[in-house]
Design a protein with these regions (language model features):
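Cytoplasmic membrane-interface "Motif A"-like loop-to-helix N-cap segments
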Residues: 80-91, 292-304
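C-terminal ends and interior cores of transmembrane alpha-helices
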Residues: 92-110, 305-320
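Glycine-rich segments within core transmembrane alpha-helices of 12-TM secondary carriers
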Residues: 151-172, 365-376
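C-terminal transmembrane helical hairpin of 12-TM major facilitator-type secondary transporters
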Residues: 297-343
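Helix-to-loop junctions at the C-terminal end of transmembrane segments
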Residues: 71-82, 283-295
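A late C-terminal transmembrane helix in Major Facilitator Superfamily
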Residues: 355-386
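Extracellular/periplasmic helix-loop-helix junction of adjacent transmembrane segments
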Residues: 37-67
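Extracytoplasmic gate region of multi-pass secondary transporters
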Residues: 34, 230-278, 373-377
Length: 417
């Protein structure tokens, strides 16, 4: 990998795992909180069941608010002081936030201090996650051997999909083994603590990393103009927004199968398993193909297919309402989404110079998640109610992908090295 003094050193597999673990923990935390939102509401918030659940979900949402700030502060740190110290800071803050929430006393024990602490820890979690993505992605791109940048970046996304699977399995195991009262009292806390167990190991391994920010960039005077890259940032926002809407639409299929298609809970969770498995394979394939053929050439085909297939896939699910239709549509849509989204992110990253890469990625990613990730499922549920059409989410996803495709025209792909 390229180091700060221009030499090259190889990353070990454990070091790569330490870098991508942060992104995996992000998705593990999100899925775990979503899975146990009811139990968290009962434990930490006042009111009846409906009110406590609403407050619990609202607290999950506050984390989206602080993500852009984390992207700015920690991303700026990564571009000025180096990727390594920024990654150590963001991962440490993430561990504090997760353990803090897991150990927060109940509302019955400390009153309004419980929801206040929950909000504080979710804000800290969002801040750390906003600062985690940019430095990590920049590090992986800069550390990758020549011609392997796409594959290295794909590892970050594959880890996220793998974390979704692990979180689902942990949640199902705890809910199956524990009585409801135990799950409410302490069972949900175990799920968060299990995820936080990787933080000490990740921090220890991150301390062994070699800095990848070029020395001339780290020592350059602050305040260089970013104006020439505003168009690239806008294009990146639109592409990442399209990928985010598509991803959250596919994640919504578990809820969609239960509430709109009226399928069994076990069948609905099967869609999550399909999503995770296909996602991991698609991430790795998308990165490999981008290295071999170039980002634009790889992303155009899958995203054009997604434009064509989204509506028919939702029509098939709503018409047949069988596990085969649900799993088949999930697999096909996930594959074409992932094969296009991984190269799209890489295309944006490669267009940014090292001096603003971590901050640029972090801010654009955080804003995309805050604006689109936090609203997609709510909007799609509302669209189904307003239109009375079960395929409304497909049209929303199709429109987003069309905008993302148009945005690729604003970015010139650098020559592959």
């Amino acid at each position: 990998m390229a180091t700060g003094d221009g030499t090259r050193a190889a990353l070990t597999r454990r070091q790569i795992a330490a870098v991508v673990a942060g992104n995996g923990l992000e998705f593990y935390d999100f899925v775990t909180y979503s899975f146990f939102a009811t139990q968290i509401g009962r434990a930490l918030f006042p009111g009846d069941a409906a009110q406590s659940l609403l407050l619990s979900l609202a607290t999950l949402g506050v984390g989206f608010v602080s993500r852009p700030l984390g992207g700015i502060v920690i991303g700026r740190m990564a571009d000025r002081r180096g990727r390594k110290p920024a990654m150590i800071l963001s991962f440490a803050l993430m561990g504090i936030a997760i353990v803090g929430l897991a150990l927060t006393p109940s509302y019955a024990a400390i009153g309004m201090a419980a929801p206040a602490l929950a909000v504080l820890f979710r804000l800290l979690q969002g801040f750390s996650l906003g600062g985690e993505v940019g430095p990590n992605a920049a590090f992986l791109l800069e550390a990758a051997p020549p011609g392997r940048g796409g594959f290295y970046i794909s590892l970050q996304f594959a880890t996220a999909d793998l974390a979704v699977l692990v979180a689902g399995l942990v949640g199902l195991a705890l809910s199956s083994w524990l009585a409801p009262a135990d799950l409410d009292a302490w069972g949900w806390r175990i799920a968060f603590l299990l995820g936080a167990m990787i933080v000490p190991f990740g921090l220890a391994l991150r301390r062994t990393l070699v800095e990848t920010l070029p020395a001339e960039e780290a020592n350059a005077p602050a305040g260089g103009s970013v104006r020439p890259y505003l168009v690239i940032a806008l294009a990146g926002m639109l592409m990442l927004g399209a990928a985010t809407i598509s991803n959250y639409t596919l994640s919504y299929l578990t809820t969609y199968a239960q509430t709109t298609l009226h399928m069994a809970v076990s069948t609905a969770f099967g869609a999550t398993v399909v999503l995770g498995l296909v996602g991991v394979l698609g991430d790795l394939a998308g990165g490999w193909l981008a290295d071999r053929y170039g980002c634009k050439r790889v992303l155009l085909g899958p995203w054009l297919l997604l434009l064509v297939l989204a509506v028919p896939a939702f029509l098939a699910m709503s018409a047949w309402r069988t596990p085969e239709a649900l799993f088949g549509a999930t697999a096909v849509l996930t594959l074409v989404h992932i094969l296009g989204s991984t190269p799209a992110v890489l295309l944006f990253m490669q267009a940014l110079p090292a001096r603003i890469r971590a901050g640029g990625i972090g801010i654009v990613y955080a804003l995309s998640i805050a604006l689109f990730g936090g609203t997609t499922q709510l909007l799609e549920t509302a669209l189904i109610r307003w239109t009375g059409s079960p395929i409304a989410p497909a049209w929303y996803m199709t429109g987003a992908i069309a905008v993302g495709l148009a945005a690729t025209l604003l970015i010139r792909e650098p020559k592959r090295r």
